[in-house]
UniProtKB/Swiss-Prot annotation:
InterPro entries: ATP_synth_F1_ATPase_gsu, ATP_synth_F1_gsu
Keywords: ATP synthesis, Cell inner membrane, Cell membrane, CF(1), Hydrogen ion transport, Ion transport, Membrane, Transport
Gene3D superfamilies noted in UniProt: 3.40.1380.10, ATP synthase, gamma subunit, helix hairpin domain
Protein name: ATP synthase gamma chain
Family of the protein in this entry: Belongs to the ATPase gamma chain family.
Transmembrane is among the record's keywords: no
Organism: Campylobacter jejuni subsp. jejuni serotype O:6 (strain 81116 / NCTC 11828)
Membrane topology listed for this record: Peripheral membrane protein
Role according to the record: Produces ATP from ADP in the presence of a proton gradient across the membrane. The gamma chain is believed to be important in regulating ATPase activity and the flow of protons through the CF(0) complex.
The keyword Transport belongs to this UniProt entry's keyword annotation: yes
Subcellular compartments: Cell inner membrane
Main location (coarse class): membrane
UniProt subunit comment: F-type ATPases have 2 components, CF(1) - the catalytic core - and CF(0) - the membrane proton channel. CF(1) has five subunits: alpha(3), beta(3), gamma(1), delta(1), epsilon(1). CF(0) has three main subunits: a, b and c.
Gene: atpG
Molecular function, one GO term: ATP binding
Length: 294
């Protein structure tokens, strides 16, 4: 009898877990739809900025006439890399399966790769998971940003990227790389590594007679465009990462719900078997008692 009570208690516990994970799955699904739409809209805008900047980059020496202009360095990779700033995004919350693993693995591998080349790498961490992971590894973090990956904010994104750009222009770092696990579709996330600074022109078709006309003056446009390019790439990465996080959490909760259902089924079978054995034992005892009285 005590065994039956224990199995019944387990069934109730697993069933409650199943209801919780199913509710979390529904919440993540609803959040994913909103995040997916935001990511799609942002991606279109970010791609258009990339295209314009890519075309301008081929004419940069015509736009910026002064060879000592510090803005030129944003387009030219240095011959000797001594320091690299790595901005990476992880989740602030858990229960999202292996969502953070890709990013943390990529960052860890890059750390080893650059250290082997005697290149100093500075980490700017966005998200509680990544911060706690590298704190546990006793690896120093240059900057820590909590609650930004779970609630992307444009002004905060600007603050993050402006600090990195300023360090590049001031000569404190030679390259800025942005790493995050991005959204591909509802069941797939993909690791994205963006070599943000210096700017790498995207592969677009170039013509001798460019259709791009620069208004206002090229230098003014470049100033505004560069600012928008860096800010929006940072902001888009946050939105893209959040959509991927909701996707991963939805899958994780769906798997947990299905596992709970399977476990309840197993426990019900065990309960019925134990109950049958209990009844059989009682019947045998009754029959034995009757026989002994004859």
């Amino acid at each position: 009898m005590s065994n039956l009570k224990e199995i019944k208690r387990k069934i109730k516990s697993v069933h409650n877990t199943q209801k919780t994970t199913n509710a979390m799955k529904l919440v993540s699904t609803a959040k994913l739809k909103k995040a997916e739409e935001a990511a799609k809209r942002s991606k279109i805008y970010a791609q258009k900025i990339d295209e314009i900047l890519s075309e301008i980059s081929f004419q940069i020496n015509k736009i910026v006439h002064n060879e000592d202009d510090v803005r030129l360095s944003l387009f030219h990779k240095k011959e000797q890399i001594k320091t690299v700033d790595l901005i990476f995004i992880t989740a602030d919350k858990g229960l999202c399966g292996g969502f953070n693993i890709k990013t943390l693995k990529a960052v860890s591998e890059m750390l080893k790769e650059y250290e082997a080349k005697n290149i100093n790498i500075r980490l700017r961490a966005i998200g509680k998971t990544g911060i706690e992971y590298f704190n546990f590894q006793k690896i120093e973090l240059l900057e820590k940003y909590f609650h930004l990956s779970s609630s992307p904010d444009y002004e905060k994104a600007c603050e993050v990227i402006h600090a990195a750009v300023d360090d590049f222009l001031n000569g404190n770092t030679d390259e800025v790389i942005l790493v995050h696990n991005g959204y591909k579709n509802m069941i797939t996330q993909e690791l994205k590594i963006n070599h943000l600074i210096p700017v790498e022109p995207k592969s677009i078709e170039q013509t001798h007679n460019s259709l791009l006309e620069l208004e206002p003056e090229g230098t003014e446009l470049l100033e505004d465009l560069m600012k928008t390019y860096f800010e929006y790439n940072m902001y888009y990465a946050l939105i893209d990462s959040l959509a991927a996080e909701h996707s991963a959490r939805m899958q994780a909760m769906d798997n947990a719900t299905n596992n709970a259902k399977a476990r309840v089924k197993q426990l019900n079978l065990a309960y019925n078997k134990a109950r049958q054995e209990s009844i059989t034992t009682e019947l045998i005892e009754i029959i034995s008692g009757v026989e002994s009285m004859k």
